[in-house]
């Protein structure tokens, strides 16, 4: 087993940081990025209770946000506060375990699930200052999360699996509600995207960003657009999420009662480019660890990603070729490091494959 470079218990107190984690000038954080981005704070309680007027207002606000930068926050979402607290406690419980215990769930090369403490092996520079634990969640297999946690970490961690099984079930429910709003706002009807994602094969990720004594030299997560469809993020109270909009980086302030929602590349393709996936990153600090819970809604692996015909016409031709989520996921895990151009490069890669052209090496990305 290759030992990862990143051992939080050792590195978080060091005055210097290994060169693999140093980001070049121009990509590393700057003090002026602390300016707050005021994304819409959308109360979806009325919509969830079936109020037509509230639903129309939510639809309008979500549509405006998605055409601008693809980020918004939701409150009165129906997620139990105690479940949220349990989910955050379980993040602490896992990431404060000794490294050898966490490595029982070590992510294998080319896979998207498991424990990762750096991307060493695939990449040798601009490494993220974070640890993650990722696992699949499918409504059609309610035991999937618990079975994975017990199989990798042991029976002692069954409760952790049960907490995240409940959390993922609630995230899937909320995702489908948001998909109804997205469909309505795009004029394709509330049912279109909900049906597409009802059998979702999604990814749950626990993020842990340890303190760093040189926070202006590294990043917790580098600039990227999510290749998935929809991200529902719950931050702790530390802060660190930044979005690139109007030519500069700006921060989204954490709210305990809110989820941050953003559009991913796959949904950008499903909307024929109408709704945007936006560049974002995570910064770290020198004082305290930061935690976040990220649910990435994804379609079933072999479902064909294509926009509804009503979003395609002479004035709005197809922006991206057909693809499956499996092909995009494999692309990001084996060939390309997700960034701001993932969907563009992936689309060109698909066209080259279809034309039988020799594919260029992508390992440098």
From Swiss-Prot:
GO terms for molecular function: gibberellin 20-oxidase activity; metal ion binding. It catalyses: gibberellin A12 + 2 2-oxoglutarate + 3 O2 + H(+) = gibberellin A9 + 2 succinate + 3 CO2 + 2 H2O; gibberellin A53 + 2 2-oxoglutarate + 3 O2 + H(+) = gibberellin A20 + 2 succinate + 3 CO2 + 2 H2O. Residues 199-299 form the Fe2OG dioxygenase domain. Fe cation binds at residues 224, 226, 280. It is an enzyme of class 1 (oxidoreductase). PANTHER family: 2-OXOGLUTARATE (2OG) AND FE(II)-DEPENDENT OXYGENASE SUPERFAMILY PROTEIN-RELATED (PTHR47990). The expression of this protein encoded by the B genome of the hexaploid wheat is much lower than the one of the two homologous proteins encoded by the A and D genomes. This is Gibberellin 20 oxidase 1-B. The lineage of its organism: Eukaryota, Viridiplantae, Streptophyta, Embryophyta, Tracheophyta.
